[in-house]
């Protein structure tokens, strides 16, 4: 996370994880395009199909929409990723779980300022304070980021604040308090057509300047995690949270082209941990209840050249999502070599929307499902195991996915909403191997196959508005491989490779009709078409030299990705690419100060490539270009009191 990295986007650590694609749009107004095994690739913003958790507090709300802008990498200690069948027990997320943990304070007290500058006017600075005294462990971090942006009309300013306090209350009780906040203001460069990309990859897309497309976000959330031991074999954990998020977004359209969204979200996850012996066999059990709710007040206005104007077509909706889930998971060890795991989760999610003006309400819909997983693990030897797992998943639409009808996105007129979208259901099988080879190498290999019915796919995207529909059958299958090696001469090597075949498995028809019945567009999405927004291959490789006695470190990074489709028809795509990065770090100790400097050059060979796409963009503005050769340099210092 911290070794010569920008510590700017969660894509930095995630690119080292096989199965995860975190495509950087170079657009802070739209977030990263994150997918896990192809799930989440259809998200128009934020993280969809992936559960986000930060210090035990969910970053994913009741309807399954996740936000990542509040993740503070400057104070993150680790980022854990769970993929496949085990992730279904986390609820409304079929693809995986991203769990971020902040650093813990070290004994005494430490103050650590940091500063970095880079290409395209990038400037980041902040201060981190941590320590531990009298059974109180604390971390406080405040950071600011500015960038002029790689593309025209893409500058951004972001401030992150993160607080973590852990109180040790006696021998059996601990209380962790979490609070974080993000303030973001970003211009939106939109996507480019193929012709625009060829002409000027750094230009803003059509409509960005005339509508002054942009986004501002203010989010604050807090929570606590109470851990209470109830004896030698039992532990109770309760984690309530509460937060609010205010978003104002100017889209590249006139009518309803300004969205003012206020969201309140809250909930609690409580679970019981139990260890026992069953017939002389070790047994672990976790059972819990997870309840969440988010309430949105959504206003829209007309975007007149970047100014918000009231109009008769303005929307005024009160929207709500709530879920109440029960889950249980057990692990039995019949022998030292065998581990058996099973779990089930009952989910109940309701989405509703009421109009506060003369426009019609969108109605309500309740989704219910029981999902589960089974896994068998066999230890060939102490540090090597093979496993097979099965899991079923459940993925409801978000409030954002039901707000627009396809005909409204394409033609305007009356918006009837899209409350009738079904939940996607997934059956997934995985086999794999995990091995630590001697003391110098580690290798993980996994093969997976996931069948989805009623997959939620993008019907159309235009002017910042996106409409969705169900695809009858899709499939995602692939290979994931990761390895790490300690080599002679103080060298270390690592690799993460993904091969993904994500395709439609049953032909379906998309029909989009305007308010005038004579204007209808109908087309076929054929079986065998690729699911857009996700590459068919991905590779991250690194060779690092580190000299322990003087703190010097040099590394070469290689990144490559296969092509990705930009629309369901597979009539547009972005070519694959390969780039190389270099980084260097130096560390010193001067008096009570620990100092480190770093510098990195990304895309050393100055390759031109597309970093991300806007799936099914109605005006063919699919492409979001990535930077050419660029640099970043910074310094960190820490003083212990």
Where are the regions a protein language model picked out?
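Surface-exposed extracellular loop regions of Gram-negative outer-membrane beta-barrel proteins
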Residues: 185-198, 293-306, 348-355, 364, ...
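A beta-strand signature from Gram-negative outer-membrane beta-barrel systems
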Residues: 61, 70-114
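Conserved C-terminal beta-signal and adjacent last beta-strands/turns
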Residues: 168, 180, 328, 388, ...
